[in-house]
């Protein structure tokens, strides 16, 4: 097995420029592909998840010209030209969910599949929503999960569409992005959400990006959304992808744990991503955080000089960045509780189980619940722990922070960070100091 040994490190400081946001990159690629006109996307993330989206769009007949982190997309005016395609989408939820919806109304015959873990990640709530407007979608193996066969269908909207919001916000995102392509009798489509909508900031990203492409979604709280029907996305001409706020969390935590000062560039006050809220969680734990429009500075205590404060917080709004808090809790002076994180169970791996298992390897006492995690740090971290990463990029990046506790740590299968941040460990090593 491939592995990477890190540390021991005693401090972390410097400046890091973030790669483009995965969530924004894949949304913008699909919107640009469906739009009228040519869109130049800058600071586009280059990672496994964006590559599978680009590959799929190419197979669907979208004209793409890539040069470094810039991509010029020639829009299809709402309909992909390829009416048959076999699309492999890896483990990219940000690709498989929105593309499934767009393909369901495109009038073609498509197969959508991915890696084995993708075939364990639920998609049934989205399929149920699409079937309400006439979509013809079959499950190849297990009911409610990919692989999917999508067939030509007569699509019509004559009643509000209902979709569950308590498993993944990507189901609602997929519907919102696709419904402008579908005609409705009164020129609009209503989507009603069943249950508590999780990850609300990601829906906000979707709505803001749709507006950049000329389509305005109205919402009544987080339970009812009104989408213009039978309209066309229009290219904004040029759009820049802001830095990835989830990826920022590892460096911000490094600054807090390793003393700093550490500056992250590419996200800040002006960010449309909810995960910038991670900075507030760090502040609650005692880190010193300042923020500009597109940068965040953090100074911490350094493990030799003190401890972070424990935290007890609802992380429903920022579940991805919350993983970083679970590891930062190793450096607190008491027990921390992460609440309302049930969505971790259906991510790249069962992140609650995985996080509990790996935190115990470095000496923590962990209580694992259906939607919560309680972490009591050890008096001293266990050196040379071999951390399994479960083909989950965030597990690998989170546990790099253990090395700032003055102990070496081994990260198994470090290449899994390629999903969102291929050169993460090089960037981390440039900031961490022995």
Swiss-Prot record:
Phosphoenolpyruvate binds at residues 22, 93, 121, 170, 351, 394, 419. Keywords: Amino-acid biosynthesis, Aromatic amino acid biosynthesis, Cytoplasm, Transferase. One of its GO terms (molecular function) is 3-phosphoshikimate 1-carboxyvinyltransferase activity. GO terms for cellular component: cytoplasm. SUPFAM superfamilies: EPT/RTPC-like. The active site is at residue 320. PROSITE patterns: EPSP_SYNTHASE_1 (PS00104), EPSP_SYNTHASE_2 (PS00885). It catalyses: 3-phosphoshikimate + phosphoenolpyruvate = 5-O-(1-carboxyvinyl)-3-phosphoshikimate + phosphate. The keyword Cytoplasm applies. It is an enzyme of class 2 (transferase). 3-phosphoshikimate binds at residues 22-23, 27, 168-170, 199, 320, 347. Pfam families: EPSP_synthase. Its EC number is 2.5.1.19. Pathway: Metabolic intermediate biosynthesis; chorismate biosynthesis; chorismate from D-erythrose 4-phosphate and phosphoenolpyruvate: step 6/7. GO terms for biological process: amino acid biosynthetic process; aromatic amino acid family biosynthetic process; chorismate biosynthetic process. It is found in: Cytoplasm. It comes from the Bacteria. Belongs to the EPSP synthase family. Catalyzes the transfer of the enolpyruvyl moiety of phosphoenolpyruvate (PEP) to the 5-hydroxyl of shikimate-3-phosphate (S3P) to produce enolpyruvyl shikimate-3-phosphate and inorganic phosphate. Monomer. This is 3-phosphoshikimate 1-carboxyvinyltransferase.
């Amino acid at each position: 097995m491939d592995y990477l040994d890190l540390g021991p490190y005693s401090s972390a400081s410097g400046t890091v420029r973030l790669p483009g946001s995965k969530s924004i990159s894949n949304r913008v690629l699909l919107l640009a592909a469906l739009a009228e006109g040519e869109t130049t996307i800058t600071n586009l993330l280059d990672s496994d998840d964006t590559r599978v989206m680009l590959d799929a769009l190419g197979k669907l007949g979208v004209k793409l010209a890539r040069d470094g982190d810039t991509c010029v997309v020639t829009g299809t005016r709402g309909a992909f030209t390829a009416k048959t395609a076999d699309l492999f989408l890896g483990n990219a939820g940000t690709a498989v969910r929105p593309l499934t919806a767009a393909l369901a109304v495109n009038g073609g015959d498509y197969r959508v599949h991915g890696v084995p873990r993708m075939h364990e990640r639920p998609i049934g709530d989205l399929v149920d929503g699409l079937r309400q407007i006439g979509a013809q979608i079959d499950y190849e193996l297990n009911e409610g999960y990919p692989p999917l066969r999508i067939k030509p269908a007569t699509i019509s909207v004559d009643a509000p569409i209902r979709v569950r919001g308590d498993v993944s916000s990507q189901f609602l995102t997929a519907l919102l992005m696709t419904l402008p392509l579908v005609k409705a009798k009164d020129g609009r489509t209503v989507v009603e959400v069943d249950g508590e909508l999780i990850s609300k900031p990601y829906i906000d990203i979707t709505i803001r990006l749709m507006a950049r492409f000329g389509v305005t979604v109205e919402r009544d709280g987080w339970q009812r959304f009104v989408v213009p029907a039978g309209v066309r996305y229009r290219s904004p001409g040029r759009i820049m992808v802001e830095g990835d706020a989830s990826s920022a969390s590892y460096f911000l935590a490094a600054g807090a744990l390793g003393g700093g000062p550490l500056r992250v560039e590419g996200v800040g006050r002006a960010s449309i991503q909810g995960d910038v809220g991670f900075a507030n969680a760090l502040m609650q734990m005692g880190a010193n955080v300042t923020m500009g429009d597109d940068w965040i500075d953090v100074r911490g205590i350094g493990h030799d000089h003190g401890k972070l404060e424990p935290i007890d917080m609802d992380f429903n709004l920022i579940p991805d960045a919350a993983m970083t808090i679970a590891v930062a809790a190793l450096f607190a002076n008491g027990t921390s509780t992460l609440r309302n994180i049930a969505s971790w169970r259906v991510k790249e791996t069962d992140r609650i189980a995985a996080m509990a298992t790996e935190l115990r390897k470095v000496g923590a006492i962990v209580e694992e619940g259906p939607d919560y995690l309680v972490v009591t740090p050890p008096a001293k971290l266990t050196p040379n722990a071999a951390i399994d990463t479960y083909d989950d990029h965030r597990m690998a990046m989170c546990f790099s922070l253990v090395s700032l506790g003055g102990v070496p740590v081994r990260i198994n299968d470090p290449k899994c960070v390629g999903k969102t941040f291929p050169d993460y460990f090089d960037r981390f090593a440039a900031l961490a100091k022995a």
